[in-house]
Amino acid sequence: MTAGKLPGWLKPMNKVMVAIQKLGITAGPVSVLTVPGRKSGQPRSTPMTPFTYGGRPHGVAFPGADWASNARAAGVGTLSRGRKSRQVQIVELSAEEARPVLRVFHDEVPVGVGFMKRTGLVQQGTPDEVEALAGRVSVFRFDPLPN
């Protein structure tokens, strides 16, 4: 597998995770982010593992991830976990802002670091390696919107 190439099983697995969440069943720390598609305008949902930094939820997107392009274009979305949903403003962080967030990602989302290792984004998965991905991976903050 080339460095940064997504595995073929990811899309089917994501569909299963979205379906499970729609039934109101939580699966570990996974949430579903739904944003309008940047071309179609139709809702697009993707599973992700948000984590807290500075008291706010954040998410990390693999290089070239469609959900990141859609989130960037929309600027707003719905973050759901089981039967609970909240509207969020989606703010992309600069590479400099992303560095300390990625260091926390290393500790908070070890499964994400393992995924980065398996796809060749990092070699050992150390905090320094993950932090060095700033500017290569997209990091977003999810600010709650009033109901």
Question: Which functions belong to the PLM regions below?
Answer:
Residues 1-30, 107-134:
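Alpha-helical membrane-targeting segments
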Residues 21-23, 57-69:
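Covalent nucleotidyltransferase core used to form phosphodiester bonds in nucleic acids
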Residues 35-40, 81-83, 144-146:
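Short acidic, glycine-rich loop/turn motifs
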Residues 28-63:
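Short beta-strand segments
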Residues 63-143:
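Short, structured beta-strand-loop surface elements
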Residues 2-17, 42-47, 94-100:
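Short low-complexity stretches enriched in small and charged residues
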Residues 53-55, 84, 147:
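Short strand-connecting beta-turns/loops that link adjacent beta-strands
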